[in-house]
Amino acid sequence: MKRLCLWFTVFSLFLVLLPGKALGAVDFPNTSTNGLLGFAGNAKNEKGISKTGTTGGKNGQIVYIQSVNDLKTHLGGSTPKILVLQNDLSASAKTTVTIGSNKTLVGSYAKKTLKNIYLTTSSAFGNVIFQNLTFEHSPQINGNNDIQLYLDSGMNYWIDHVTFSGHSYNASGSDLDKLVYIGKSADYITISNSKFANHKYGLILGYPDDSQHQYDGYPHMTIANNYFENLYVRGPGLMRYGYFHVKNNYSNNFNQAITIATKAKIYSEYNYFGKGSEKGGILDDKGTGYFKDIGSYPSLNKQTSPLTSWNPGSNYSYRVQTPEYTKEFVTKYAGSQSTTLVFGY
């Protein structure tokens, strides 16, 4: 009898200590910071001063999120946590959840959707990873400030293998909502291996006012290995003030892709622009930023802003692929996934 009790105790300890799973848990891409690149990684500023890379909730408690209330409870604060969606989360109306710091929010392979859930920063929090998520929202939530991922403070954010699925739209309609806003003092961000689709407006990057020059230099941002499909404008984005490294992305079915606005420093490399490029809308250049492109397809013209002297190679090391490879890769691997994540570089 004693031997049986001892065996049961040892077996119970084995269950408690077994890594990566818990009772009732779900499979998820527990990849830590594998695949992290660009400004959210180990990068330097313009003075050559290095910063640490984004770690999110690394080494923190794994918490399985089953409800919107769970998400509100655990996404705030500064305690490191890895938050795994065990259920798809949905709200009937716009529901805002505040982002804290030192968090990884990751969708499981089976359940990964946030519908009408709007994530926003507060104060100077940061060091957050968003991975393997699908953002959806109702078409009637379409005001100017209706943006599902809103980052305006803190540093070190990594948005990876995330899908913003959008919805049908009328290009001449009154929709003003966007998919993503990153600006004000938010800094050192990478968007990678993600998909943005089916929306009138895509991404707005940098403080959205041409007279607020105190935000010059924000954000430092890498946009790499992403797929922009059927965004009428702003995919990859409308860019102001910051440093934007835009490499190996595929934009298709667009009216305007890159909008160059006030004091944006944009270094574009080896992107592929598909249907829509024949209309001449790859560059929407206001003439007030700085821009350079190398190797994109087709060749970019209609540039009126001066060439940027900035090169992201002074901030971090990186590699590039051809535009043709990029198109094939992101079509297959960008966005949230139901199996293993594949990372571009």
Swiss-Prot record:
UniProt-listed Enzyme Commission number(s): 4.2.2.10
Subcellular location: Secreted
Keywords: Lyase, Secreted, Signal
UniProt signal peptide: 1-24
Active-site residues (renumbered): 234
Recorded GO MF terms: pectate lyase activity; pectin lyase activity
GO cellular component terms given for this protein: extracellular region
Alphabetized InterPro entries for the sequence: Pec_lyase (IPR002022), Pectin_lyas_fold (IPR012334), Pectin_lyase_fold/virulence (IPR011050), PEL (IPR045032)
Catalytic activity as recorded in UniProt: Eliminative cleavage of (1->4)-alpha-D-galacturonan methyl ester to give oligosaccharides with 4-deoxy-6-O-methyl-alpha-D-galact-4-enuronosyl groups at their non-reducing ends
Keyword Cell cycle: no
Principal place of residence: secreted
Domain of life: Bacteria
Presence of the UniProt keyword Lyase in the record: yes
Family named by the database record: Belongs to the polysaccharide lyase 1 family.
Function: Catalyzes the depolymerization of pectins of methyl esterification degree from 13 to 75%, with an endo mode of action. Cannot degrade polygalacturonate.
PANTHER family assigned to the protein according to its UniProt record, in alphabetical order: PECTATE LYASE 18-RELATED, PECTATE LYASE 21-RELATED
Name recorded for this polypeptide: Pectin lyase
